[in-house]
A protein has these predicted regions:
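Signature of N-terminal electron-transfer/Fe-S-associated modules in redox systems
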Residues: 1-202
Length: 202
């Protein structure tokens, strides 16, 4: 059967409206939902899960406002279908910090005034998170290149790059402090009441 106005068949319309049950993890929480196979990931997050921190901007994968992390990879939520997240782990801006405190990136953005209207900020933060997970000590030029896929009409980008540099520096210092603490614990004498030969040699 063919639609006389648009020339589309009923079977094609049925395919567009087809639904599929998916299971995925969003910010550490197991989720199971039935979704339209044509629904984009950003729409699923916003409309089905109420995670409205992922913003919908250009809808063409250009502006970066809808950026989320899927299995450790930065993706555009407006170009990714929800069904493509089947069995995967999705991280949104809402999952950037699970402690109730500002994440190291959020704190740096706040200190450097790296936001104004805030529309691009969630995508910026998640892109910066992906950068920090991928590269340990990126140069300022590398940071600029990595962030070039995220558009901001307000800040001029200078403060954003400054904030990311600050977050990277603090993260590195925190990692060094944690490593030192672990080393001290491993060298601490046993409190079990017996002393091994290896401890005596220390």
């Amino acid at each position: 059967m063919t639609d006389s106005v648009f020339g589309t068949s009923a079977s094609a319309t049925d395919a567009v409206e087809q639904r599929m049950r998916i299971q995925l993890e969003v910010n550490g929480e197991r989720i199971e939902r039935e979704v339209l196979v044509r629904q984009h990931l950003v729409d699923f997050l916003r409309e089905e899960l109420g995670l409205t921190g992922s913003h919908l901007g250009c809808e063409h994968g250009v502006c970066g406002a809808c950026s989320v992390i899927v299995d450790g990879e930065l993706v555009r939520g407006c170009l990714t279908l929800a069904v493509q997240a089947q069995g995967k782990a999705v991280e949104t801006i809402e999952g950037l910090s699970d402690s109730g405190q500002l994440d190291i990136l959020q704190q740096a953005f706040l200190e450097h005034n790296a936001m104004q209207c805030g529309f691009c900020t969630p995508g910026m933060l998640l892109t910066a998170r992906a950068l920090m997970q991928e590269l340990l000590e990126p140069s300022r030029e590398v940071i600029r290149e990595y962030m070039s896929g995220n558009y901001c009409r307000c800040t001029g980008y200078q403060a954003i790059v400054d904030a990311i540099e600050t977050a990277i520096r603090r993260s590195k210092a925190l990692g060094a402090a944690n490593s030192l603490g672990s080393a001290k614990e491993s060298l601490a004498p046993s409190t079990s009441g017996t002393v091994s030969a290896s401890e005596v040699s220390l």
